[in-house]
Amino acid sequence: MPLPWSLALPLLLSWVAGGFGNAASARHHGLLASARQPGVCHYGTKLACCYGWRRNSKGVCEATCEPGCKFGECVGPNKCRCFPGYTGKTCSQDVNECGMKPRPCQHRCVNTHGSYKCFCLSGHMLMPDATCVNSRTCAMINCQYSCEDTEEGPQCLCPSSGLRLAPNGRDCLDIDECASGKVICPYNRRCVNTFGSYYCKCHIGFELQYISGRYDCIDINECTMDSHTCSHHANCFNTQGSFKCKCKQGYKGNGLRCSAIPENSVKEVLRAPGTIKDRIKKLLAHKNSMKKKAKIKNVTPEPTRTPTPKVNLQPFNYEEIVSRGGNSHGGKKGNEEKMKEGLEDEKREEKALKNDIEERSLRGDVFFPKVNEAGEFGLILVQRKALTSKLEHKDLNISVDCSFNHGICDWKQDREDDFDWNPADRDNAIGFYMAVPALAGHKKDIGRLKLLLPDLQPQSNFCLLFDYRLAGDKVGKLRVFVKNSNNALAWEKTTSEDEKWKTGKIQLYQGTDATKSIIFEAERGKGKTGEIAVDGVLLVSGLCPDSLLSVDD
């Protein structure tokens, strides 16, 4: 049965309302979904892009930036997100990464547009983390010994603390511990430098022995071990670290070579080399020329009395001179050869002496009469036989030869000085003189050589003449002291115009003050070449001449 209209109308209205309600519900649900997207805003019942946003071709709201983001992207209304290396509101400014802290590069940084570049110093290479590592290795620099790779690069090493790196950074140089004074050896030992180290060794003339539970340097007795080089006609005396030689009675020489004094010889003929003989002649000729050029005479005294002889057989007193053997620890064969050679030289010298005496006496050279002719000045000369004589002092020009190798005077080395004077061969290979080499001692060190004149009280004036030489730059000073009650400095020389031998003079005036000795003192300078030398020492009666001729003239 059909429903009545009155009943059907309400049902129709409710159905229509239900249908529209469902559509509105669906439409509301879509708006809510759209409202959750960025840049979507709800305007009443409508959904639209927010301010600063606009719908793109895909129907999605996207932000807008004015005037835009040059090197970046717009992430909000007028809000830019810049790409790395750029900054600013519109991302148009470059970032200087090299000025940032910490610096992005280890060595060198160069800024670029929107980025930067790192560079390494020479000898290094760039790593991915912008650090620099040394590109050189130990195999590339060729060290002398060992090498170590470090952060700064390969480093050459020396195997000992006694070595140091050379300026080239590869080789090792020795450190001289002895010269630097970094080490001090025990008593009686000397420092010997080696490559990379050093050791302490006994001084020459000593040997290492184990005594009383410890090692010590003990003196070698060269005399008992027959390792000395003294002449067969000399006595050997052992000293600490060395030995001394002294000619036996009846012989003369330096102890290493001794020759017999002839029985019939004229007392101590002047045996100086030609330069000294010539100088004596010139000096005497000069003095006699002041006396109306009188001729030089050789006076042969008449025997009248027998004086008490005083024997002084040492032309150079080597009791204070150490004659060091070159091979103190053995080598008898070498020493025997030296002794044999010395003995042959002595025989030849002895024979030459006899012939020379006869020749000189006939030729009229200046010589010493066989008398105690030192009466004028108290000096006793050598006498092997008791002789009688009578002198007329006014007729004598007395000259005493105090040269080192054949003179008649006593010379001694000072024990309290810093170094000894050393014999040095003359240029003509005849005889020797005394010298101080530039390498002897240190700066300001003193070496003294004494000429002994016991009880010299001149009854007339005497002149001391000597040859000297100061060779080398800043080699030192030479002084001469006359030792008496005053010990006065009589002569001094510090420099020389050239390296030639020159002649010095000191006047010994008549008086009551006894002259005990004359001291030649050498003071070392800072020079490393040359020498200080003395030769041809003479005592001549009378006043010193006003002018002297050079030995080299």
Curated annotation (Swiss-Prot):
GO terms for molecular function: calcium ion binding; integrin binding. Gene3D superfamilies: 2.60.120.200, Laminin. GO terms for cellular component: basement membrane; extracellular space; membrane. Residues 400-546 form the MAM domain. PROSITE patterns: ASX_HYDROXYL, EGF_1, EGF_2, EGF_3, EGF_CA, MAM_2. InterPro entries: ConA-like_dom_sf, EGF-like_Ca-bd_dom, EGF-like_dom, EGF-type_Asp/Asn_hydroxyl_site, EGF_Ca-bd_CS, Growth_fac_rcpt_cys_sf, MAM_dom, Nephronectin_domain. It is found in: Secreted, Extracellular space, Extracellular matrix, Basement membrane. Residues 331-363 form a coiled coil. Residues 291-350 are annotated as: Disordered. Glycans are attached at N397. The keyword Signal applies. Residues 1-21 form the signal peptide. The keyword Hydrolase does not apply. Residues 65-91, 94-133, 137-173, 174-212, 219-259 form the EGF-like domain. Residues 333-350 have a biased composition (Basic and acidic residues). Keywords: Basement membrane, Calcium, Cell adhesion, Coiled coil, Developmental protein, Differentiation, Disulfide bond, EGF-like domain, Extracellular matrix, Glycoprotein, Repeat, Secreted, Signal. SUPFAM superfamilies: Concanavalin A-like lectins/glucanases, EGF/Laminin, Growth factor receptor domain. Disulfide bonds join C98-C109, C105-C118, C120-C132, C178-C191, C185-C200, C223-C236, C230-C245, C247-C258. Its main location: secreted. Residues 301-315 have a biased composition (Polar residues). May bind integrin alpha-8/beta-1 and play a role in hair follicle morphogenesis. Promotes matrix assembly. Belongs to the nephronectin family. This is Epidermal growth factor-like protein 6. It comes from Homo sapiens.
